[in-house]
């Protein structure tokens, strides 16, 4: 039987009677459970990543789908891919119910698939549903249709055996237990979702060759700090002085291109 663990009563009571220190320590105690829950989900995360990579090598994309906090986290992770890895913003796309962070659009079971078809989704793409409850109609409808069309589906949820997981080729079930404030899934569930999204996109981008050693050699040079960081990467890699390294970087636009051009 499907049980919404994420909606179960908090392990703590009379929160309004607690001191600030007690509240903070309680929240921190609960947050420490999140990393362990994510650790237990690593085999499923690995399974999803290893299926995403070959699809992306063929031109596939990742679509995150969610509502509320879950949707916003998908949009956030997607927005970090271009500056961090120098990839186009069309490669990882976050879709949120309503098109913007609108709270009530999540009950439309058809709209999610409509948004995917508007973006010409293909069987090279991957759809990842994000919902702590695992019951969001907007997400479930999109995943169902995607799967019917032979598209890889994954999900991230805080409840076992959810309706959303039933539509996933790979279900990442991150069981963090009841929230500190009962039902407030922006807390532990949201923290765990962000950790897993980081793991998915970072490991995918590494597998796609967007990291060298441990460095973001394809990052966008969008501010002075990143230009300085990129320059120091080139100094370390090629042994040039700072001025020459910076000039080389600015000429070619990325650390990788600058290093490759210098070595030709």
Question: Could you say what each language-model-derived stretch is?
Answer:
Residues 63, 67-195, 204-208:
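Glycine-rich phosphate-binding loops that contact phosphosugars or nucleotide phosphates
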Residues 1-37:
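Cofactor-/ligand-binding subdomain signature composed of acidic, glycine-rich
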Residues 60, 151, 240:
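Short glycine/serine/threonine/alanine-rich loop segments
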Residues 30-40, 101-102, 126-129:
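Short, basic, glycine/proline-bearing loop/turn elements
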Residues 204-264:
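Short, amphipathic alpha-helical interaction segments embedded in low-complexity terminal/linker regions
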Residues 40-55:
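A short, well-structured juxtamembrane/interface segment
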Residues 1-16, 117, 148, 240-264:
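N-terminal charge/polar-biased segments
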């Amino acid at each position: 039987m499907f049980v919404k663990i994420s909606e179960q009563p908090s392990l703590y009571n009379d929160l309004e009677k607690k001191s600030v220190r007690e509240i903070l320590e309680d929240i921190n105690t609960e947050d420490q459970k999140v990393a362990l829950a994510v650790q237990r989900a690593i085999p499923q995360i690995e399974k999803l990543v290893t299926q995403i990579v070959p699809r992306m090598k063929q031109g596939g994309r990742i679509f995150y789908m969610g509502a509320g906090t879950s949707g916003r986290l998908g949009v956030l992770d997607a927005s970090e891919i271009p500056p961090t890895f120098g990839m186009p913003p069309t490669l990882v796309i976050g879709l949120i119910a309503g098109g913007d962070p609108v709270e009530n659009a999540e009950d439309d079971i058809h709209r999610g698939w409509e948004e995917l078809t508007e973006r010409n989704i293909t069987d090279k793409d991957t759809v990842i549903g994000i919902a702590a409850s695992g019951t969001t109609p907007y997400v479930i409808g999109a995943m169902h249709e995607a799967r019917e069309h032979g598209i890889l589906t994954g999900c991230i949820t805080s409840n076992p055996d959810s309706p959303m997981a039933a539509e996933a080729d790979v279900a990442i079930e991150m069981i963090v237990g009841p929230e500190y404030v009962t039902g407030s899934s922006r807390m532990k569930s949201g923290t765990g979702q962000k950790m897993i999204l980081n793991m998915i996109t970072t490991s995918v981008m590494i597998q796609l060759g967007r990291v060298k050693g441990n460095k973001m050699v394809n990052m966008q040079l969008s501010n002075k700090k990143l230009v300085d960081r990129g320059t120091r990467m080139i100094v370390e890699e090629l042994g040039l002085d700072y001025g020459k390294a910076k000039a080389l970087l600015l000429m070619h636009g990325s650390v990788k291109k600058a290093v490759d051009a210098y070595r030709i």
